[in-house]
């Protein structure tokens, strides 16, 4: 059966994706072919989710970047590191 949702060549930043709904969104987007940036304030939690996604869907499907979205400098860093990881951002999920 062909997937109804082809996210190949899509790159998503998902805020608050180290647990709960954000983690589920990241997992499903990766399942359908997207590269995902896992972000929250807690880098250890982000890294765990990214490792889980990468082990399930392949190396370099996910990366972890710590970010407090209320801090402008951290947001700039999130953008720069995300572009380094995947080249462009096609999707932003504001879950935090």
Would you name each region that the model predicts?
Residues 62-64:
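Hydrophobic/aromatic anchor residues within beta-strands of the central parallel beta-sheet
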Residues 32-49:
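Conserved glycine-rich Rossmann-like NAD(P)H-binding loop of the short-chain dehydrogenase/reductase
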Residues 15, 89-96:
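Rossmann-fold scaffold of SDR-type NAD(P)-dependent oxidoreductases
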Residues 43, 66-78:
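The beta1-alpha1 cofactor-binding region of Rossmann-like NAD(H)/NADP(H)-dependent oxidoreductases
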Residues 1-13:
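Flexible N-terminal pre-Rossmann segment of NAD(P)-dependent oxidoreductases
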């Amino acid at each position: 059966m062909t997937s109804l949702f082809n996210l190949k060549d899509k790159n998503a930043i998902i805020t608050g994706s180290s647990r709960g709904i954000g983690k589920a969104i990241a997992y499903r987007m990766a399942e359908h072919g997207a590269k995902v940036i896992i972000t929250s304030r807690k880098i250890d939690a982000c890294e765990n989710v990214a490792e889980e996604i990468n082990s399930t869907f392949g190396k370099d499907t996910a990366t972890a970047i710590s970010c407090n979205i209320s801090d402008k400098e951290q947001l700039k860093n999130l953008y720069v590191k995300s572009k380094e990881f995947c080249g462009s951002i096609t999707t932003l999920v504001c879950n935090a």
